[in-house]
From Swiss-Prot:
The active site is at 83 (schiff-base intermediate with substrate). One of its GO terms (molecular function) is transaldolase activity. The keyword Cell membrane does not apply. One of its GO terms (biological process) is carbohydrate metabolic process. Gene3D superfamilies: Aldolase class I. The keyword Aminoacyl-tRNA synthetase does not apply. This is Probable transaldolase. Keywords: Cytoplasm, Pentose shunt, Schiff base, Transferase. It is found in: Cytoplasm. The lineage of its organism: Bacteria, Bacillati, Bacillota, Clostridia, Peptostreptococcales.
Length: 214
């Protein structure tokens, strides 16, 4: 499973990129707004840091407007992927993007049927929202499994991005479910580094070494 970071914060991206684990980045209007910076400039800076798909979301709701809005985004860098909401207009836009050779990420996917429709429209990626499903008492990782099974049965090549990752168990569950990609907030990636036994082990090694060199 590949790892993307879900953020628009340049410093967070730079830090995690140095770990050698990043295959891409996802952003959304909320994350961009949080940074208080020019959208296109942020996307351009991200493409200079990470070599891989960079999802940039359109804010228009009509297919024709989405297609127009995306032109400035795809002009930034070939790795820019247009993020589109899972709606009828979104699917129309995905079809248009696919015909132009522009990659798309269909977001806000909450059912296997939505994932099937998105794939058939030509989506390069679909993003089932694991955490938000858990919030309403459904099992997000089970949706990922269902989508994978459907795609495998029908030979669909659309990649599945497990999104709305809230904690480290979500990341583990996404990997076990077989997601192609998990897009993970900075906080959860940092938490994934940690285990108390690791810290204890390092402390013991250092104490043992200090005792040896005295």
């Amino acid at each position: 499973m590949k790892l993307f970071i879900d953020t628009a914060n340049i410093e967070e991206i730079k830090e995690v990129a140095q770990w050698g684990i990043l295959s891409g980045v996802t952003t959304n209007p909320s994350l961009i707004a949080k940074e208080g910076r020019d959208f296109k400039q942020v996307i351009a800076e991200i493409t200079a840091i990470v070599e891989g798909p960079i999802s940039a979301e359109v804010v228009s709701l009509q297919a024709e407007e989405m297609l127009k809005e995306a032109q400035d985004l795809v002009a930034i860098h070939p790795n820019v992927v247009i993020k589109v909401p899972m709606t009828a207009e979104g699917l129309k836009a995905v079809k248009g993007f696919s015909e132009q050779g522009i990659k798309t990420n269909v977001t806000l996917v909450f059912s296997a049927n939505q994932a099937l429709l998105a794939a058939r429209a030509g989506a390069s990626f679909v993003s089932p929202f694991v955490g938000r499903l858990d919030d309403i008492g459904q099992e997000g990782s089970e949706l990922v499994r269902q989508i994978i099974e459907i795609y495998d049965i029908h030979g669909i090549e659309t990649e599945i991005i497990a999104a709305s990752i809230r904690h480290t168990q979500h990341l583990t569950d996404a990997a076990l479910a077989g997601a192609h990609i998990a897009t993970v907030p900075y906080k959860v990636l940092k938490q994934s580094l940690l285990h108390p036994l690791t810290d204890q082990g390092i402390e013991k090694f250092l104490k043992d070494w200090e005792g040896l060199v005295k």
